Amino acid sequence: MIDVKDLSENPDKFRASQRARGADESVVDAIISADSARRAALIRYENLRAEQNVFGKKVAQAKGEEKQALLAEVKELANSVKAASAEADAAQTKQEELLRTVPNLVEDGVPEGGEDDYVVVKTVGTPREFPDFEPKDHLEIGELIGAIDMERGAKVSGSRFYFLRGVGARLEMALLQMAMEQAIEAGFIPMITPTLVRPETMQGTGFDVKHDAEIYRLAEDDLYLVGTSEVALAGYHADEILDFSAGPIRYAGQSSCYRREAGSHGKDTRGIIRVHQFNKVEMFIYTTVEEAAAEHQRLLAWEEEMLAKCELPYRVIDTAAGDLGNSAARKYDCEAWVPTQGAYRELTSTSNCTTFQARRLNIRERAVNAEGVAKGTRAVATLNGTLATTRWIVALLEHHQNADGSVNVPKALQKYLGGLEVLPVL
């Protein structure tokens, strides 16, 4: 949720952010109007309450007919107070509903436009060439080495489901373990998170549970399957006051993730690039507003460290405003080269959500003024970033393949596979 005080004082900044996202600017003026109505209703209520208190004292001192007359006025005034209270509550509700429709304020420097308007920050490594043989795609390789079974996945669960078996299962577990160990070495607390969450937790992270077609819902229990452990990790400290005296609070969550892929009909139908269920290690950070940008760069560096360990050529892109999720003020994606597609495909993303999620989830820290004196509380900043996920297998199999379909294991991964140097053809 955005800061209504900031919006009221700097409406042009929020209009510009909405324009950059391709979103409706008029909501900014609607919120300002709703805030004015809320303030007016609250003032009316408080004035009537004060008047009610005065009448209460008069009634206590009055006698006889005067007291009866005053009691009649008090009753009428009580009805007015009740109506004013309802009006103030309604104005507050309307304002909150409008605020929940506004995505996070975009950071300065984020590219304007949509999905194709990203800016390439840097490119690392060179896409592999195959002068001696025609490269196979990840599914063909996966079938040759007994790693991926899409046919039985579809038989058991439907389209976009799969089995990882044998070296495929081992490879995913190795990736996730390497990612988790790296996170722990960087000071993250490892977490195994719930994959079902309450609607208030899902909404708190910025998802629209009523209109988001990507989310699986268990209607009888009113619970939602998460598409990332970010959701559970964001809700972990809901309604709490955090202490950053020892620095940022960093968690690394491992979980299964679920996405309906409702808008992906016909896209990436072959293999495991776009699936309904996958596993992931997600980094999540709580920190101060002042430290958020620096933490964002650290998250990106940790993601790049994993890509380097996997010996994959990749690029980093600064995602355009119109392609940002509601919660993100800025997002960087790391995309690895997929040889048979002749394209870079996203393997990781990292987002700075500033105070957006924390305001929705009521996560705060104790504030101090310039003299170090306590001054109430304020919203914290939250950030997230992917460290490893099932999709990495796509790039690993294709980039490190041999002519016969076997796959060389990157050196850093070998110890997590019992020293295995090559994934052999069966």
Curated annotation (Swiss-Prot):
Binding positions for ATP? R259, R260, E261, V275, E346, L347, T348, S349
> Segment Disordered: which positions?
1-22
Write out the residues that bind L-serine: T228, S229, E230, E282, T386
According to the UniProt entry, its GO molecular function terms are: ATP binding; serine-tRNA ligase activity
Entry's Gene Ontology cellular component terms: cytoplasm
Major localisation: cytoplasm
Superkingdom, taxonomy of origin: Bacteria
Q: In which pathway does it act?
A: Aminoacyl-tRNA biosynthesis; selenocysteinyl-tRNA(Sec) biosynthesis; L-seryl-tRNA(Sec) from L-serine and tRNA(Sec): step 1/1
Kindly state which reaction or reactions the protein catalyses.
tRNA(Ser) + L-serine + ATP = L-seryl-tRNA(Ser) + AMP + diphosphate + H(+); tRNA(Sec) + L-serine + ATP = L-seryl-tRNA(Sec) + AMP + diphosphate + H(+)
Keywords assigned? Aminoacyl-tRNA synthetase, ATP-binding, Cytoplasm, Ligase, Nucleotide-binding, Protein biosynthesis
Among the record's GO biological process terms, what is one?
seryl-tRNA aminoacylation
The Enzyme Commission number assigned here is 6.1.1.11
Q: Mind telling me which PROSITE patterns this protein's record contains?
A: AA_TRNA_LIGASE_II
Biased composition, Basic and acidic residues: where in the chain? 1-15
Report the Pfam families cross-referenced here. Answer: Seryl_tRNA_N (PF02403), tRNA-synt_2b (PF00587)
* Subcellular locations according to the entry: Cytoplasm
Q: Top enzyme class of this protein?
A: ligase
Q: How does it assemble?
A: Homodimer. The tRNA molecule binds across the dimer.
Q: What does this protein do?
A: Catalyzes the attachment of serine to tRNA(Ser). Is also able to aminoacylate tRNA(Sec) with serine, to form the misacylated tRNA L-seryl-tRNA(Sec), which will be further converted into selenocysteinyl-tRNA(Sec).
> According to its record, what is known about the domains?
Consists of two distinct domains, a catalytic core and a N-terminal extension that is involved in tRNA binding.
* Entry similarity comment: Belongs to the class-II aminoacyl-tRNA synthetase family. Type-1 seryl-tRNA synthetase subfamily.
Q: What is this protein called?
A: Serine--tRNA ligase
According to its UniProt entry, this protein's organism is Pseudarthrobacter chlorophenolicus (strain ATCC 700700 / DSM 12829 / CIP 107037 / JCM 12360 / KCTC 9906 / NCIMB 13794 / A6) (Arthrobacter chlorophenolicus)
**What high-level taxonomic lineage is stated for the organism?**
Bacteria, Bacillati, Actinomycetota, Actinomycetes, Micrococcales
